[in-house]
């Protein structure tokens, strides 16, 4: 009987440790989540997807060094108009970020487009989030309309995702489960 209880407790301990090992929400002494850059943030979320939840993606910007398939990619921030055109990030706010990354549906960007942005100053999160929402909601869409836009903050990072409602909801859920600090700032249907 003692051996059985010890075996049971050992299995329980092993399972508990394995579950804790899947959490990536490590924080520094100030309570901020430790994230190296926007690409790492998106990669961590993308890697939390089960294989049957994933879809074909092309990521990064159109430069040879940043263009990626099947994984999040770095998006250059030097061309503010390209940030706006491809990700919906307002060109006027490009000077407020120092790092960006993206994930886009390979067949149609309106099906799923996600951008992650590191803000130079965390105090700008609310104003940039409002500008981003206004910029995406005010677009003229071609090749189909996205269903939904979600903007999420994570310390000094902003993440925006728009597209098919099911894909957007899955991403939002994965991000908020992976990073306990994540806060949904806005969640709107696109009309």
Which functions belong to the PLM regions below?
Residues 11-12:
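Repetitive helical segments and hydrophobic/amphipathic motifs
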Residues 21-113, 119-191:
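Soluble, non-membrane globular domain cores that form compact, hydrophobic packing
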Residues 1-8:
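Bacterial N-terminal signal peptides that target proteins for export
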Residues 15-19:
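C-terminal motif of bacterial Sec signal peptides marking the signal peptidase cleavage site
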């Amino acid at each position: 009987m003692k051996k059985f209880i010890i075996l049971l407790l050992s299995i329980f301990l092993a399972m508990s440790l394995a579950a804790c090992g899947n959490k990536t929400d490590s924080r520094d002494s100030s309570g901020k989540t430790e994230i190296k850059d926007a690409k790492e943030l998106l990669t961590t979320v993308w890697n939390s997807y089960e294989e049957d939840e994933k879809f074909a993606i092309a990521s990064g910007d159109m430069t040879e060094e940043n263009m990626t398939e099947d994984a999040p990619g770095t998006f250059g921030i030097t061309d503010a108009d390209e940030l706006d055109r491809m990700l919906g990030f307002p060109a006027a706010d490009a000077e407020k970020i120092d790092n960006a990354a993206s994930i886009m549906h390979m067949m149609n960007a309106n099906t799923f487009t996600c951008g992650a942005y590191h803000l130079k100053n965390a105090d700008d999160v609310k104003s940039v989030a409002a500008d981003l929402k206004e910029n995406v909601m005010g677009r003229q869409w071609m090749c189909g309309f996205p269903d939904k836009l979600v903007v999420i903050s994570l310390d000094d990072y902003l993440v925006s995702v728009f597209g098919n409602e099911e894909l957007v909801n899955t991403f939002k859920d994965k991000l908020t489960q992976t990073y306990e600090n994540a806060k949904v700032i806005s969640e709107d249907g696109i009309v």
